[in-house]
């Protein structure tokens, strides 16, 4: 070995020696592994009973999570699903975009269902950006302009709000709570900017400022520096769980662009959306529905536009929590899951809605993609044009044709249902830790 290489080798060893770990705990993460609606909220609800803090890191009220607790069904859009656990602190991080009217409406609706004492256990980042009503109007107009090539946006203003953030004329929660005259000037400027681009939008600036003066006082008790809060919690050994919104295939960078959301809903968004370094991440739980669904437009290789798709839609009650649109349905897609596992680094899987497959005599699983010329693809296509022209190859597995809804022990599942789970494990080389066979948290089976 040359002297230079020897020195470099020593330097490399030195770099990795003597590391000090300033944290006493880790951050576990729950991420959607497909196109959303996998059942992340239920998984978070299950795990939140054992953690100190639950966080949202990205997205806005375009996300929809349903949690059933003590027989009551809660719908969350901005609030982390962990708020149903009264011993848990819920954090809305800096990467989230917040429409305050929707947040307050969501709080009121869920308080009416029995959610209590949120003022003592909800923290909102002062660095989170605000979504204004005009962002929502612009969202609808931009979607209408696309005509037959619409992206299927929720029209909640999420994209325009992130656009304002990226062009550096967005407004953050902390600015609303500071000098209100400075906030007013900035609000007038952002409205003027949007009016130049979209002259037909109607904004009553003075009425909005009056409204936001009230919102400032309503939201003030919840707001603090969440970055310091979370790092202090980790140094003190507090357990933290992050609830990813949307899902990997809707990620702005890694999803089926442009049929995606406007934020990073993969593991990277957890770090930037909460101000966490990579070494704080512990378990990364990929939530996988036992079949595949998608809301809105965009390519969907394993989609079933037939009686199978109809059966999955009907049995699975596949209607969007936020949009109320019927979800498109298809078979489980292994190449897609391998891809999102590469990006996110799943340490384990929670497989949900296995019971929806109970009536099928046989079940197909997409196992590989082929190009139009017959060549197998060894990677997930990077463009929608390429993804739209692939041919899907399926494995056919025997069904079990008996109800799994009331089973609570993995070994009591029908053999073919167990084989379906093991097939997924083998194909992904990631262990399946939980299997869901119903709506409530009690319907989640511990596999190992």
From Swiss-Prot:
PANTHER family: ADENYLOSUCCINATE SYNTHETASE (PTHR11846:SF0). Belongs to the adenylosuccinate synthetase family. Homodimer. Keywords: Cytoplasm, GTP-binding, Ligase, Magnesium, Metal-binding, Nucleotide-binding, Purine biosynthesis. One of its GO terms (molecular function) is magnesium ion binding. InterPro entries: Adenylosuccin_syn_GTP-bd, Adenylosuccin_syn_Lys_AS, Adenylosuccinate_synth_dom1, Adenylosuccinate_synth_dom2, Adenylosuccinate_synth_dom3, Adenylosuccinate_synthetase, P-loop_NTPase. GO terms for cellular component: cytoplasm. The keyword Cytoplasm applies. It is an enzyme of class 6 (ligase). Its EC number is 6.3.4.4. Binds 1 Mg(2+) ion per subunit. IMP binds at residues 37-40, 62-65, 154, 168, 246, 261, 325. GTP binds at residues 36-42, 64-66, 327, 353-355, 436-438. It is found in: Cytoplasm. Plays an important role in the de novo pathway and in the salvage pathway of purine nucleotide biosynthesis. Catalyzes the first committed step in the biosynthesis of AMP from IMP. It comes from the Eukaryota. Mg(2+) binds at residues 37, 64. The keyword Transmembrane does not apply. SUPFAM superfamilies: P-loop containing nucleoside triphosphate hydrolases. It catalyses: IMP + L-aspartate + GTP = N(6)-(1,2-dicarboxyethyl)-AMP + GDP + phosphate + 2 H(+). This is Adenylosuccinate synthetase.
